[in-house]
């Protein structure tokens, strides 16, 4: 948690000036009861209107100066807190971007969103209050006690007892609420998760008529969050009644004891009023300390959660090495007895997989659901590191490549087509910011997307809405394929990225890829046998094991798993025609 304070770098002056101006304001506030006492004991007692007006003018002056100091302090504290939050948010985003898929899978997207938004906002708010109140409130409490002592040392004992009682109440309540606030933030993660799942999967929920069940699950989770927050609220609600009870009892004791001392001439009426005002100042500032502690408690809990992410080391360090040159005659991609297990999984997703893909080859990857197809190409792209064995690209261990060089070498089209807000040109230039229109149109032609892009108003400047929702599923897939083709990578991975295309468009896409990407190694992942049958060789996966690695005809003859896949999609006569 202490490491977070480094994000105040550059705002040290503001962080110093904010509490100093608040303490200056507090000094003026401590003089107010003495001025009021002088008005009562001198001005009112002697019916001296001039004196009264002078002292009232002094009160106004103290108020104006105090307000100016307060506004200045708030300006500095807000600037420091905003700078802190901005720097922390930037570094957290940058750190999350370095985490491997393994860490991201373990943490979860909803948790990361909550850390980035709600938790950082809590820390920022807590810092803002701390800069303004951490020194001011204790200073006023201590100052009020000293000022009261100068008026009546005996009655100051009542102040000390009241202050101790209120402090004990605040401490007990804070101790009880700290774990509750932490539990509330964890419960908020769950609410965020359910909300995201239902918004992203809204069509699936409706297709299976699961609205009622999902609503019930959300209501239960939301009610659990409400119950935790209600518990924290009930505990916190005890603070004001208990503290005001202590203060009111103290004021009664002050009036009784002070009245006797006024009667005996030990104290004046103005001094009794000053003591009561100092008691009020102590109460107000102890309550502010309580609010500060609540805010700091939440901020600390949130800060710990943010620190957990910042302290999560990536298991995939970037070697940041100089560009590696291909080893002559080496495969574009090769697996050497690779085994991989996802974090928390009961067994490996890939087991002892070995193969080689030569430069310029089209490699089909096929298998049933859960057979490990996506896992295999994720290892080629180094989204994960192999648990054992080695993955090599162009003769070098994949871990020796810098991420920058690796991303230039590999173009990836994921299963879920993702487009970003902007224009078609903006999306096409993601991997190649300096790509020309001719290069973009060439990629669109290969991806079978040029015709519908030309039909859009503005063509390459046509707007892309959030998540590409103004395009059909097939159009989104073709645009993401084109985006991967624009930088002309050495290796292209198509991870079941033509599932929304009709057979004619799919066939045209495969033909264009084979004709116009010569020299490019293409991994074509699909559950359609028709999509991979013309590949140079096909990797057949079954429950994480490589059970076939050969051209289509050889696999039909020698691989029962591949033959079963083909016969499940075509008749025997149709299969025979493919030979």
Language model regions located:
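Helix-loop-helix
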Residues: 47-51, 147-161, 231-305, 309-310
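Helix-loop junctions and hydrophobic alpha-helical segments within the transmembrane domains
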Residues: 92, 96, 205, 306, ...
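ABC-type nucleotide-binding domain
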Residues: 326-579
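Transmembrane helix-loop-helix hairpins at lipid-water interfaces of multipass membrane proteins
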Residues: 9, 15-72, 76, 149-154, ...
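Transmembrane helices of ABC transporter permease
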Residues: 10, 14-27, 128-183, 256-267, ...
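An intracellular "coupling" helix at the cytosolic face of ABC transporter transmembrane type-1 domains
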Residues: 10-13, 98-102, 118-127, 131, ...
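Alpha-helical segments in transporter systems
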Residues: 5, 13-34, 55, 59, ...
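Conserved catalytic Walker-motif region of ABC-type ATPase nucleotide-binding domains
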Residues: 96, 218, 306, 335-337
């Amino acid at each position: 948690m202490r490491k977070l304070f480094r994000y105040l770098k550059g705002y040290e002056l503001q962080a110093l000036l904010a509490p100093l101006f608040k303490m200056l304001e507090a000094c003026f506030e401590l003089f107010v009861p003495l001025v009021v006492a002088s008005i009562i004991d001198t001005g009112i007692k002697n019916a001296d209107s001039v004196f009264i007006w002078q002292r009232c003018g002094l009160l106004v002056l103290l108020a104006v100066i105090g307000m100016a100091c307060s506004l200045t302090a708030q300006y500095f504290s807000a600037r420091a807190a905003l700078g802190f939050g901005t720097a922390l948010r930037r570094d957290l985003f940058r750190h999350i971007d370095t985490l491997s898929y393994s860490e991201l899978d373990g943490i979860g997207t909803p948790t990361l969103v909550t850390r980035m938004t709600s938790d950082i906002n809590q820390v920022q708010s807590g810092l803002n209050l701390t800069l303004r109140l951490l020194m001011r409130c204790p200073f006023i409490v201590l100052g009020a006690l000293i000022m009261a002592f100068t008026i009546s040392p005996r009655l100051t004992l009542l102040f000390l007892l009241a202050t101790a009682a209120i402090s004990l109440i605040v401490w007990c309540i804070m101790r009880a609420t700290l774990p509750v606030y932490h539990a509330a933030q964890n419960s908020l993660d769950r609410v965020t998760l359910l909300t995201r799942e239902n918004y992203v999967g809204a069509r699936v929920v409706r297709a299976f008529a699961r609205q009622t069940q999902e609503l019930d699950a959300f209501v239960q989770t939301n009610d659990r969050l409400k119950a935790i927050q209600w518990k924290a609220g009930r505990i916190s609600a005890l603070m004001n009644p208990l503290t005001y009870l202590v203060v009111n009892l103290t004021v009664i004791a002050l009036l009784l004891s002070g009245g006797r001392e006024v009667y005996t001439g030990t104290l004046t009426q103005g001094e009794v009023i000053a003591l009561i005002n100092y008691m009020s100042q102590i109460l107000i500032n102890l309550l502010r300390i309580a609010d500060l502690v609540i805010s700091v408690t939440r901020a600390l809990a949130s800060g710990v959660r943010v620190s957990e992410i910042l302290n999560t080391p990536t298991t995939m360090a970037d070697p940041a090495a100089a560009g590696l040159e291909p080893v002559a005659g080496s495969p574009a991609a090769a697996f050497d007895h690779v085994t991989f297990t996802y974090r928390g999984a009961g067994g490996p997703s890939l087991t002892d997989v070995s193969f080689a893909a030569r430069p310029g080859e089209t490699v089909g990857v096929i298998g049933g659901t859960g057979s490990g197809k996506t896992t295999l190409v994720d290892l080629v792209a180094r989204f994960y590191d192999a648990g054992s064995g080695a993955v090599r690209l162009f003769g070098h261990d994949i871990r020796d490549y810098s991420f920058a060089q690796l991303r230039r070498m590999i173009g990836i089209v994921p299963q879920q087509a993702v487009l970003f807000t902007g224009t078609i040109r903006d999306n096409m230039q993601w991997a190649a910011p300096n790509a020309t229109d001719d290069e973009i149109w060439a990629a669109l032609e290969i991806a079978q997307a040029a015709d519908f892009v030309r039909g859009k108003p503005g063509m390459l400047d046509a707007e892309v809405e959030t998540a590409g929702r103004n395009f059909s599923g097939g159009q989104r897939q073709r645009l993401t394929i084109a985006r991967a083709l624009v930088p002309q990578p050495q290796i292209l991975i198509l991870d079941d990225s033509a599932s929304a295309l009709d057979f004619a468009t799919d066939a045209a896409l495969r033909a264009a890829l084979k004709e116009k990407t010569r020299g490019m190694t293409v991994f074509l992942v699909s559950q359609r046998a028709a999509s991979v049958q013309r590949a140079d060789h096909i990797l057949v996966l079954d429950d994480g094991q490589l059970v076939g690695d050969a051209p289509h005809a050889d696999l039909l003859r020698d691989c029962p798993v591949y033959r079963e896949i083909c016969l499940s999609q075509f008749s025997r006569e149709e299969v025979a025609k493919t030979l």
